[in-house]
Swiss-Prot record:
KO phenotype (gene knockout): Altered 5'-processing of primary pre-tRNA transcripts with short (<5 nucleotides) leaders; in the presence of the truncated inactive allele encoded by rph in strains derived from K12 W1485, including strains MG1655 and W3110. In the presence of wild-type (catalytically active) RNase PH no effect on processing. No effect on growth rate, a slightly stronger effect is seen when combined with the inactive rph allele.
GO terms of molecular function: hydrolase activity, acting on acid anhydrides, in phosphorus-containing anhydrides; magnesium ion binding; mRNA 5'-diphosphatase activity; RNA NAD-cap (NMN-forming) hydrolase activity
Protein role: Master regulator of 5'-end-dependent mRNA decay. Accelerates the degradation of transcripts by removing pyrophosphate from the 5'-end of triphosphorylated RNA, leading to a more labile monophosphorylated state that can stimulate subsequent ribonuclease cleavage. Preferentially hydrolyzes diadenosine penta-phosphate with ATP as one of the reaction products. Also able to hydrolyze diadenosine hexa- and tetra-phosphate. Has no activity on diadenosine tri-phosphate, ADP-ribose, NADH and UDP-glucose.
Protein name as catalogued: RNA pyrophosphohydrolase
A Gene Ontology term for the protein's cellular component: cytoplasm
Amino acid sequence: MIDDDGYRPNVGIVICNRQGQVMWARRFGQHSWQFPQGGINPGESAEQAMYRELFEEVGLSRKDVRILASTRNWLRYKLPKRLVRWDTKPVCIGQKQKWFLLQLVSGDAEINMQTSSTPEFDGWRWVSYWYPVRQVVSFKRDVYRRVMKEFASVVMSLQENTPKPQNASAYRRKRG
C-alpha cells in the first residue's frame, strides 16, 4: 500500500524503560541497529499495526507495554536510490511513519526476538535516550531526531519520577 507520492505507510516504535533508556535492536545478521518498525496493512489502523509489529519483532503484547505518546504528524524519509526497487509498481521511494512511544511495564525477560519465522532482529540492548539519533543509518537520522525531540519531555518526566538511591557513591563502594 504505497501512497500517491511513493511513500509506504509504516509505524515506528520507541520502547523505553522506567529509567528513560530506550530499546535499541540489531538487525538480523547485520551490524546496523534501529528501533522496531513495520508496514501498515490495508484496513489496519496505525495502532493495530504497532501492536502487530511489536509482537512480530520483539515478542511483546499489549499487556507488556503502555502507550505514552504518538507523533502528532506522519514523518517521512526517502530511501537511498540504491535501496529503491525500481522494478516494482508502484515504486516505493520511502516510508511515511507514525511513531509510538511505549513504556515496558513487564520485565526484560518478556522480550523475544524469535517470534517470527523470519526475525527482523537478533539482539537488543538498553541505551541512553539520545544515542539512537547519532547511531542510526544516515537516511533515517532526521526522522529519528524529530521523533526523539517530540517524545523527550515524556521520557524525561519518567526519569524524574524514578526513585534514586539515597547515597549512590556509598552504594558503588559496597559493591566494588
